[in-house]
C-alpha cells in the first residue's frame, strides 16, 4: 500500500503521444558523449570516422534520446510494464551496436594507455565475462524490490539505465569489437555466444510472464490503458522480452554464420580473422 501511495504522487495522469518531457540528465549525458565523439573525430588528421560511422553513432544517440524522453518514457514509467520492456530491449539490443559500429578502433585506443583501463578492459570484454556482467545486471534490476525502487526514484532509475547501457555495450563487444587489442570471438564462438545469451533472458522472461501475481505492483496503481489489466500487461512484457529478445539473437547468429561462410570463401579480411578469439571458452583464458 505504501508503494502504491508513493506511485500516485507521480505527476503523469494521462498519456499524451505528442508530449515530450525532456530530462536534463539525459540531455547532458548525450551531449557530453556526442561532444567527446565529434571533438575526437575533428582532431583526427585524415583518419576520421567514415560517414557511415558518424551516422551510426549519431543514430545511437538519437535513439537513446527518443526512448528516454517523451511518450515512450511516460508509457514505460507510469503506465505499462510492457512498454518498459520495449524501451529496455531497444537500449540493450539496438543502441549499443550502433554506438560500437560508429566508433573506430583508433578513437578508443588512447584509453588503453591508462593503467586501470589496460588492466581491466581485457578482463571484462571476454565472452564469459561480458555474458556474466550483462545477465547479472539484467536479473538484478528485474528483482521486484529493485525494479519498483527505480520507478519510484528518478536517480535510481538513471543508475538502472546507465548500468543497462554499459552492460549491453560489454555484451556486444565480443561480437563487434573495433580493437584488435580487445578482439572479437571467432565466428563459431560468436554463434555459441549468441545462443547461450538467449538462455538467461528467456528464464527471466518466462518467470515474469508466468508469475501468478503482479510482480511490479506500481503498474497496478496506474491508470489503465486500452483495457490492459496489470496481469496481462506483465504477461505481454514477459513475452516481449522472451520472443523478440530471443529471435534477435538468432538473427545475429544468422548474420555471423553468413560472415563465417564469406571468410571461408575469402570474402572477409585476414586482419579480422586474426583479430578474433579462438572460441567462446578460450576467451576466458
What are the residue ranges of the model-derived segments?
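Alpha-helical membrane segments of multi-pass proteins
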Residues: 1-285
Amino acid at each position: 500500500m505504501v508503494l502504491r501511495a508513493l506511485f500516485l504522487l507521480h505527476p503523469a495522469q494521462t498519456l499524451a503521444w505528442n508530449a515530450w518531457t525532456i530530462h536534463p540528465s539525459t540531455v547532458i549525458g548525450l551531449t557530453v558523449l556526442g561532444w567527446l565523439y565529434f571533438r575526437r573525430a575533428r582532431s583526427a588528421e585524415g583518419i576520421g570516422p567514415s560517414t557511415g560511422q558518424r551516422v551510426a553513432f549519431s543514430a545511437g544517440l538519437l535513439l537513446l534520446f527518443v526512448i528516454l524522453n517523451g511518450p515512450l518514457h511516460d508509457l514505460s514509467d507510469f503506465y505499462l510494464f510492457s512498454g518498459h520492456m520495449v524501451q529496455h530491449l531497444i537500449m540493450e539490443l539496438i543502441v549499443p551496436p550502433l554506438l560500437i559500429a560508429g566508433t573506430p578502433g583508433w578513437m578508443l585506443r588512447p584509453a588503453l594507455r591508462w593503467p586501470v583501463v589496460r588492466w581491466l578492459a581485457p578482463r571484462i570484454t571476454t565472452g564469459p565475462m561480458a555474458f556474466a556482467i550483462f545477465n547479472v545486471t539484467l536479473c538484478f534490476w528485474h528483482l521486484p524490490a529493485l525494479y519498483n525502487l527505480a520507478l519510484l526514484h528518478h536517480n535510481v532509475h538513471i543508475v538502472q539505465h546507465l548500468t543497462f547501457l554499459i552492460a549491453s555495450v560489454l555484451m556486444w563487444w565480443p561480437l563487434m569489437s573495433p580493437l584488435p587489442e580487445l578482439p572479437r570471438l571467432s565466428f563459431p564462438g560468436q554463434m555459441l555466444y549468441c545462443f547461450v545469451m538467449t538462455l538467461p533472458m528467456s528464464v527471466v522472461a518466462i518467470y515474469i510472464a508466468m508469475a501468478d501475481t503482479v510482480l511490479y505492483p506500481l503498474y497496478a496503481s496506474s491508470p489503465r490503458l486500452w483495457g490492459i489489466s496489470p496481469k496481462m500487461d506483465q504477461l505481454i512484457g514477459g513475452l516481449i522480452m522472451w520472443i523478440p529478445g530471443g529471435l534477435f539473437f538468432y538473427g545475429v547468429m544468422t548474420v555471423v554464420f553468413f560472415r563465417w561462410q564469406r571468410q571461408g570463401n575469402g570474402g572477409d579480411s585476414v586482419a579480422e580473422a586474426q583479430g578474433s578469439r579462438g572460441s567462446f571458452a578460450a576467451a576466458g583464458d
